[in-house]
Amino acid sequence: MKSPTTYLLPYADISWQPDNTPYANAFEDIYWSNAGGLEEKQYIFLEGCDVQYRWRTLTPNARFTILETGFGFGLNFLLTVRAWQSEPHPQNARLEYIAYEQHLVSPHDLKKMAGLFGLEAELELMLEQYPEPVPGNHTIWIADDICLHLVVGEIHDQIETLEAEVDGIYLDGFTPSQNDAMWNEALLSKLVSCLRPGGKVSTYTVAGALRRALIKYGLTVEKAKGFGRKRDMLIAEKPGDWQPASHNIKKIIVIGAGLTGLLCAKALRRRGHKVSLVDQTSEPLGALRQIKQIAIYPQLSKTPQPYSNLYLRAYQYFLRHQALHACGRIE
């Protein structure tokens, strides 16, 4: 992997066609079918992976995890959020969504998409925390029961450190003939290894190399009726009976109610744990309450380094969740 020379990756280079279909100039491909973008995504991915049917079997403290290759405009994610929020779930059940994207779509293009599909409300939740295009993992809490892990950068560089068990995989990269890196066997092997027994994979393409690779790595593969004018699509399943994953709730004591202690307690509670906060004073923050202003800044280097990239992403995360009056910009 080449060392980066800038902290920010460029946004996706997009041209809007006369019928309001976005076209990725770098990959010479469209982001969705002009026959119906929302219906296409709903049919291929949400229905292909049976997500709503499986959600109805979740138990208290369950975690349902989806992994997507090719986040793009976030249509699959926004539709999944809308579906999740449209029905009740057991106590402390949560949706985890892991998505990879080499080039984020700009906020301007995202807003145009939302206007076309009536997704303004769902997009607003995401845009409030939408990161600058800094490579790496960005954790975005859409709600207490919905967490998006948006991973920016080349997927082969980023996925090496992934440790997750997922219930469904949306394979939604650009067409294999234009984006071979998103469909090669090394990546597919890693993805399949993360899939839980009974977990499903869905995609719009029926390319022979993809079918053979999924079968090679142990999945049962079938062709299904495609969307619109497309004759076929692929659905694959890992052998075994699918069961909801349960999150182990722990009782945790955090000692110290300073800034770090409060943030740790908040993070643990958000993940469903039962937290007790212990401090020698009766008020949170103690002496820090006397401070009228604080300055938060990342430690950066002249050129991006692993540690400075981590600091920058942590800084962005802090700003997203503390409702601070931030100023300045990242360049």
Region locations from a protein language model:
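Rossmann-like AdoMet
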Residues: 1-64, 81-117
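The AdoMet/dcAdoMet-binding core of the Class I SAM-like
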Residues: 58-166, 185
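A short glycine-rich, Lys/Arg-flanked "PGG" loop and its adjoining helix->strand segment in the class I
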Residues: 184-197
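Conserved beta-strand signature within the Rossmann-like core of class I S-adenosyl-L-methionine
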Residues: 198-205
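Class I S-adenosyl-L-methionine
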Residues: 207-248
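N-terminal Rossmann-like FAD-binding beta1-loop-alpha1 element of flavoenzymes
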Residues: 250-277
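Glycine-rich FAD pyrophosphate-binding loop
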Residues: 270-290
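Dinucleotide-binding Rossmann-like beta1-alpha1 core, especially the glycine-rich loop
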Residues: 295-331
